[in-house]
Amino acid sequence: MTVAKSTCASVSTKPAVGKPTNGIATYSPAYTIVPTYECFNRCTYCNFRTDPGESSWMTLSAAEDIFQRLQNEQVCEILILSGEVHPHSPKRQAWFQRIYDLCKLALTSGFLPHTNAGPLSFAEMQELKSVNVSMGLMLEQLTPKLLETVHRHAPSKLPELRLQQLEWAGDLQIPFTTGLLLGIGEGIDDCWETLETISKLHQRYHHIQEVILQPHSPGNQQTFDAPAFNPHQLPEVIAKARQILPPDITIQIPPNLVQDEQWLVACVEAGARDLGGIGPKDEVNPDYPHLQAEELREILQPVGWELVPRLPVYPQFDGWLSKELQASVRRWRELVIYF
């Protein structure tokens, strides 16, 4: 994201960290399941995808083995994160069924699924609602100029297509996470306009749990030749986002992409009160290992922030879930405090 000169000039080389706050920051104890890495989009900043047909799909038996192993781990969320099969591909139905079956298996194994699998049809979203406590899709940036650059070969990154997902999630009463990718060629006003659009949709549907502010972080697989988003600018972006978004939307940042501990604290103090799903591997940014919960506590506690686990669905949305899902969530609300 390009920032006006006046904004850049105001950015200090040291974060403005205040006095101990006695505040709370949250995270979700999570594990990521990837049904497939294959994706028909070719976003130039991507470090996740493989070409269609080049990687195998996760089998249910392999997932069952993973879920069995996780029974003794402190994990509540199963993030189903998938590459995208084209909506008109003959493999689309099998792909969707695999995602549904993995969600169902996660539930029966005692976990809480959250799916992010790119744009879905209304019927697909409706079906997945029955086996997910929440879902998500990044807006990234809504400016159409990115369709000429980083999204030139990414048909599902059409802004109107992704906005439609947020509207359908509202219609279906699906607790939803969305977010922005910072530093992929957008301008500063593009960022604010995307946040304002999210705010307006939430005021209509009241369904957005979290907005992720994810700084572009170069990886070994991408072809996009651009530096990492400047972490010194992130607290300022967070503070502005906090002004734009309704107070009941939580701002989330990925802590492994803010590698300076002081700047991570500055981001939390600026208003990013959630650190996302913490698991063994960041599948989207594999070159940046996750900081684990104890490491994050060692950073946050000395400056007055308590790190607290949460579920992948916020309490105000429990009533939107089926009775079966509500029962699973109730069990976890009693357990997660012991993590």
Swiss-Prot record:
Its cofactor is [4Fe-4S] cluster. GO terms for molecular function: 4 iron, 4 sulfur cluster binding; 7,8-didemethyl-8-hydroxy-5-deazariboflavin synthase activity; iron ion binding; transferase activity, transferring alkyl or aryl (other than methyl) groups. Its EC number is 4.3.1.32. Gene3D superfamilies: Aldolase class I (3.20.20.70). Pathway: Cofactor biosynthesis; coenzyme F0 biosynthesis. The keyword Zinc does not apply. InterPro entries: Aldolase_TIM (IPR013785), CofG_family (IPR019939), Elp3/MiaA/NifB-like_rSAM (IPR006638), F420 (IPR034405), rSAM (IPR007197). It catalyses: 5-amino-5-(4-hydroxybenzyl)-6-(D-ribitylimino)-5,6-dihydrouracil + S-adenosyl-L-methionine = 7,8-didemethyl-8-hydroxy-5-deazariboflavin + 5'-deoxyadenosine + L-methionine + NH4(+) + H(+). The keyword Cell cycle does not apply. Residues 25-256 form the Radical SAM core domain. Pfam families: Radical_SAM (PF04055). [4Fe-4S] cluster binds at C39, C43, C46. SUPFAM superfamilies: Radical SAM enzymes (SSF102114). Keywords: 4Fe-4S, Iron, Iron-sulfur, Lyase, Metal-binding, S-adenosyl-L-methionine. Consists of two subunits, CofG and CofH. Catalyzes the radical-mediated synthesis of 7,8-didemethyl-8-hydroxy-5-deazariboflavin from 5-amino-5-(4-hydroxybenzyl)-6-(D-ribitylimino)-5,6-dihydrouracil. Belongs to the radical SAM superfamily. CofG family. This is 7,8-didemethyl-8-hydroxy-5-deazariboflavin synthase. The lineage of its organism: Bacteria, Bacillati, Cyanobacteriota, Cyanophyceae, Nostocales.
